[in-house]
Amino acid sequence: MEFGLSEEQKLIVETTRAFVENELYPHEREVERTGVLRRELIEEIKAKAIEAGLYAANMPTEVGGAGLDTVTWLLYEKELGRANYALHWTCVARPSNILLAGTPEQREKYLYPCIRGEKWDCLAMTEPGAGSDLRGMK
């Protein structure tokens, strides 16, 4: 049994590592010093991630993503994780809740635009007695 990385996985790691070094690292000092991630910078990085084929990599190809398998996705996330998390987050579309449970109308309105980088996805949770403390939910 082979436990090494496939050629595709090696390419994803190399591409993502180069992206982190060339597009994310140069902005880390500013973001960490100011505590601000400027909207213009978010849009710039997101556009470059889309151009590089790295945005929405976890989403299935049927909905416009790259369709990475779980191991390859984790390798991708590991490389992105080398950078400041706020910068890392600008490279990833995560509308998985809509993918898994959304209606066709919700997919059209939210999922596909998120995957194309036209809209931002987000998630909010609350529960009586826990508020927004996700660890306190029962």
Regions found by a protein language model. Name each.
Residues 11-12, 44, 75, 109:
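Short, solvent-exposed alpha-helical surface patches in well-structured domains
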Residues 65-66, 105-138:
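Glycine-rich, Trp-frequent "lid" loop and neighboring beta-strands that shape
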Residues 1-12:
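Intrinsic disorder at enzyme termini
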